[in-house]
Amino acid sequence: MIDSNFAGNAAYTFPHFLGPIKEQRNLALEYFKRAVDVSLELGTDIIGSPAGGMSNKVSYDSKLREEAYKELLEYLFVLAEYASKSGIKEIQIEATPLETEFPHSPGASLKLMEDLSGSSIPYKLLIDWGHALFSPLLKEEADIDIWFEKCKKHIGGIHLQQTDGLYDRHWDFTNPNGIITPEKILEATKKSGLDDIYQYLEVVTAYEEKDEIVFKNMKKTMEFLHKNLGV
């Protein structure tokens, strides 16, 4: 069963709806319309992706940042209308660990959802454990409990990874330097009422790693998670 169709690493090659020129932003709309079409062909009615990335010049200029945000909303409303007419039921936006993207914090995530509340179909958040715990950016808000509590009614999915909170690691669960424990996963999701939300394992291995090592560590990771999460 395919539950949803989510953009992968290739999506990060492009700035999408926050690109510096109009042509890029328009192409992003076509890209996501095609994602809608492909998702329906695959038999799923949920799509998701990060929204895009700004330049530093735009991100750190309050006026330009606000203009970019308003245009992002316009594109997302248009995309939702197309997706709704096509048969998609939900679009998920991933919160990322970069201030040059929307959204990047619990507050920004909540604001985005509120600003999109009138869209043709619901927008939801995709929260990534590693992004939510990225302390260099989030400081005291690098706390999964804060994210879950503030955003819980808007969360449609969760990305699960192992990390140290210093970078967006996307380690598997064999890494001894990780700070995410099964106990915390269970406790945080239960406390916030999110224990029925799908958590998708998202591991990004080094491109140089040998296939047999990747396979071995992924097998150990899945065994570890199944055993300790009771699934």
Where are these regions (language model features)?
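Short secondary-structure transition/capping segments
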Residues: 15-18, 59-62, 170-172, 211-212
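Aromatic-lined substrate-binding rim segments of carbohydrate-active enzymes
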Residues: 1
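Active-site-proximal loop/turn and secondary-structure-junction residues that shape catalytic pockets
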Residues: 8-13, 51-55, 95-99, 129-133, ...
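Detector for Asparagine
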Residues: 5, 9, 26, 56, ...
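Active-site acidic/histidine proton-transfer and metal-coordination neighborhood
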Residues: 17-124
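Hydrophobic residues in well-ordered beta-strands that form the structural core
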Residues: 4-6, 48, 93, 127, ...
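Short hydrophobic/aromatic-rich motifs at helix boundaries and adjacent loops
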Residues: 6-9, 50-53, 80-85, 157-159, ...
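Histidine-acidic metal/acid-base catalytic patches
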Residues: 43-45, 77, 103-231
